[in-house]
Swiss-Prot record:
Residue ranges of DNA binding: 19-38
Pfam family, one: HTH_1
InterPro entries associated with the record: LysR_subst-bd, NocR_PBP2, Tscrpt_reg_HTH_LysR, WH-like_DNA-bd_sf, WH_DNA-bd_sf
Gene3D superfamilies: Periplasmic binding protein-like II, Winged helix-like DNA-binding domain superfamily/Winged helix DNA-binding domain
Molecular function per GO: DNA-binding transcription factor activity; sequence-specific DNA binding
UniProt xrefs under PROSITE patterns: HTH_LYSR
Record-annotated HTH lysR-type domain positions: 1-59
Signal peptide coordinates: none
The encoding gene: nocR
This protein's name: Regulatory protein NocR
Organism: Agrobacterium tumefaciens (strain T37)
Length: 300
């Protein structure tokens, strides 16, 4: 069987045209190079060089073999390069699942910053409901997820992130627009555009209003916070939404105000539990946490 050391000797001989120069190139003795070439010729049963005194002339067979050996070494060099890039986290792919609110704009900024100095890193961002995020990440279909989380979920490691305060949205010209903070009692009798009854934020909003004895007119509900913002901008009522969606919609005609009492907006980074995350995933998680901590939203 051909040995790798024999090929490592054959290649520099072909490149330099002599045993001595090849020995100098790879920093071994000339007799050692000569012995490896003889062993290679004996192994394959073919003469690779015509010897005339101190001169070597490659045979036709040597030329054919050299092409294959070059492919082999080029492949190894490429593997070395890939391994080095992976070590630096400059190569690879990320699959991220995220529920709607952070995916609207925030995640785009995180990805843009993360891959700016990683030209060989690819990212796939899938925007799905929170429950689907949990399912997909637990099945290891995705490397990392961002989800609203209520309690533990099997197959997942969760990393809590800063909890933000939900905000109150008002249409332009609303009677409360001059207030820096809207209190629940200010909304007595108001038309309140609500999220779906199964939404955690909706439940928390209802609890905050009920604790203050506030009664609102809940004529319109929407399963999507972005639709709620649009309805507010059309003067259909006021709304309580997460700060991600409110920020994304801020260029439109809506007024954003702090809301009291606090309606917490909790979510988490989730990862599969079966194995430690690859370095690239760990670095993306760290970048994500840094970006969340830098947000100007009110925290709890």
């Amino acid at each position: 069987m051909i040995q790798s050391r024999q090929l490592e000797a054959f290649r520099p001989v072909m490149l330099t045209g002599g045993m001595t120069s090849a020995a100098n190139l790879v920093r071994i003795t000339q007799p050692a190079i000569s012995r490896l070439i003889r062993d290679l010729e004996e192994e394959i049963g073919i003469s690779l060089f015509e010897r005339t005194g101190n001169r070597l002339r490659p045979t036709r067979e040597a030329g054919i073999l050299f092409k294959e050996v070059s492919r082999h070494f080029n492949g190894i060099q490429h593997i070395d390069k890939v391994a080095a890039e992976l070590k630096k986290s400059h190569m690879g792919s990320l699959r991220v699942a995220c529920y709607t609110a952070p995916a609207l704009s925030f995640m785009s900024g995180v990805i843009q910053t993360f891959i700016a100095d990683r030209p060989d890193v690819s990212v796939y961002l899938d925007t799905v409901p929170s429950q689907t995020v949990l399912e997909l990440v637990s099945l290891q279909h995705y490397d990392l997820g961002i989800s609203i989380l209520a309690g533990d979920y099997p197959g997942l490691t969760t990393e809590p992130v800063p909890s933000f305060r939900a905000v109150c949205l008002l249409p332009p010209g609303h009677r409360l627009e001059d207030k820096e903070t809207v209190h629940a009692t200010d909304l007595e009798g108001e038309s309140l555009i609500c999220l779906s009854p199964v939404s955690l934020l909706r439940m928390q909003t209802d609890a905050a209003l009920d604790s203050c004895g506030v009664h609102c007119n809940r004529r319109i509900e929407s399963s999507l916070a972005l639709n709620l913002c649009d309805l507010v901008s059309r003067g259909m009522g006021v709304g309580i939404v997460d700060p991600f969606t409110a920020d994304y919609y801020s260029a439109n005609p809506v007024i954003q105000r702090s809301f009291d009492p606090v309606v917490p907006y909790h979510f988490a980074i989730v990862l599969p539990t079966d194995s430690p995350p690859p370095r690239l995933v760990s670095e993306f998680r760290a970048a994500l946490l840094d970006a969340l901590k830098a947000l100007p939203y009110e925290t709890i």
